[in-house]
């Protein structure tokens, strides 16, 4: 199947190429970049040297000849291409936030008017597999909402409050140079940011509601002195005391058939470079608070890997094709 990657020069685009090179059904025929058009893909993705022989082109959607497309462009840019890809019948997974939320919530959260809105399934396969299976366009979730939602999903509807505390590697901020991600500011430091108003919070609230939860949902992110990975600690407060055996059964039943969720101690070293989400939890003695911890690689399960997982479901491939690999440890 011929694949086009629109916006392939960023970190997520590079990881997408890395994964697709091992996918037996995928052939990357187009990789676009406005700033690098005419140069080899390996000019900035040096780790792919000798593995791909392709030059970047300008993102001209009308002339893309592919069976499937990945939109890996920034928020507000994806809406320029999404409708055209749909019109041409090219199945697509979109990495941006442009189609993750209802129009009014998106416009309030991102401060822009949506120029080409349509509804799309929200691509956490563990929650929305059937919608993804029948879709021609899927909105790939944000990295923070992926790890957070999976941590709490089995018990979300039993909670009155869910508080997510996430810590992320700096690659989540993208490859643009900024003071926030400047080495002296990040090294040997942990930086909370957007403490009460991160733009991924509406996605977390949306998915909690989808799971039947009426809980108040809160979120605070922190920046880690690491390249990859997100550790999320979910404080889940229940309406009434719970028994540990019941909690264990809820998690085991919810994830028993999920190829990329593992119930084991959540550590960045266990998932780095992989599409796995590792989850463990402890129940407070009085049974009213569950602390669930999840670990994902923000560029894989939080971006490129989940996008490939969604593509596999949309196209009827083995769901794990191209992303069946362990984490890199040590």
Curated annotation (Swiss-Prot):
Annotated GO molecular function terms are: N-acetyl-gamma-glutamyl-phosphate reductase activity; NAD binding; NADP+ binding
Listed EC numbers: 1.2.1.38
Short name of any one Pfam family annotated for the protein: Semialdhyde_dhC_1
GO BP term (any one): L-arginine biosynthetic process
Q: Show the disulfide pairing.
A: none
Q: Which reaction does it catalyse?
A: N-acetyl-L-glutamate 5-semialdehyde + phosphate + NADP(+) = N-acetyl-L-glutamyl 5-phosphate + NADPH + H(+)
Q: Where in the cell is it found?
A: Cytoplasm
Q: Which GO terms describe its cellular component?
A: cytoplasm
Keywords noted in UniProt? Amino-acid biosynthesis, Arginine biosynthesis, Cytoplasm, NADP, Oxidoreductase
Top-level taxonomic group? Archaea
Similarity-based family:
Belongs to the NAGSA dehydrogenase family. Type 1 subfamily.
What is the protein named? N-acetyl-gamma-glutamyl-phosphate reductase
Q: What species is given as this protein's source? A: Methanocorpusculum labreanum (strain ATCC 43576 / DSM 4855 / Z)
Q: Which gene encodes it?
A: argC
